[in-house]
Amino acid sequence: MSTIKSGDIDKGSFLLFKGMPHIVLEREFSKMGRGGSIVRLKLKNLKNKSVIKETLKGSDTVEEIEVLEVNSQYLYKDNESLIFMDLETYDQFSVNLRDVVNLEDKVLFLQEAEVYSLIKWGNEVIDLKLPPKVAFEVVDAEIAVKGDTVTNAMKNVTLHTDLVVKAPLFINIGDKILVNSETKEYAERVKV
């Protein structure tokens, strides 16, 4: 593990803070009078999922966690676990939904046979990176009523992973759409 000055911490950094692994959710740098500076951090504990806010001096140091990014193929969901395959060794392994921060929110974006980046600390999976936009097929869509032409009229559509998002009225069953994985909002229709 290496130490890093608080002024060099970025959003998404992995830190060992008070003996526990954390991910930086937000970072705000403020320059004070007479050359001093402070860094305000919003940290999420990767073990118990608690969120804390910390204020550090610009000269303070914290331990940065050495993490490994591993590409793995998602195979299927089994009760409370997700089954992946390591693309180098072809070994299958499971990741418990409760062991990874925000994994329950990301499950609806996972598609079988797709490759995802898993963040490992030692032998433990601590995070899953999704692509910024994910393509889905629409399996159910509300019927658009004639006259619903107010600007930005939206309707609920259900995607093949059971994720429900708001989409424009012209989206129909069978269409493929891109969804922003961070905001869970419709991004665009996939052109065929």
Curated annotation (Swiss-Prot):
GO MF, any single term: translation elongation factor activity
Pathway the protein acts in: Protein biosynthesis; polypeptide chain elongation
GO biological process: peptide biosynthetic process
Alphabetical list of InterPro entries matching this protein: Elong-fact-P_C (IPR015365), NA-bd_OB-fold (IPR012340), Rib_uL2_dom2 (IPR014722), Transl_elong_fac_P/YeiP (IPR020599), Transl_elong_KOW-like (IPR013185), Transl_elong_P/YeiP_cen (IPR001059), Transl_elongation_fac_P (IPR011768), Translation_prot_SH3-like_sf (IPR008991)
Transmembrane segment boundaries: none
Keywords, sorted A to Z: Cytoplasm, Elongation factor, Protein biosynthesis
One cellular-component annotation, GO: cytoplasm
PANTHER family, per database record: ELONGATION FACTOR P, TRANSLATION ELONGATION FACTOR KOW-LIKE DOMAIN-CONTAINING PROTEIN
Record-stated family: Belongs to the elongation factor P family.
NCBIfam families named in the record: efp, PRK00529.1
Function as written in the Swiss-Prot or TrEMBL entry: Involved in peptide bond synthesis. Stimulates efficient translation and peptide-bond synthesis on native or reconstituted 70S ribosomes in vitro. Probably functions indirectly by altering the affinity of the ribosome for aminoacyl-tRNA, thus increasing their reactivity as acceptors for peptidyl transferase.
Protein name: Elongation factor P
Source species: Borrelia recurrentis (strain A1)
Gene field: efp
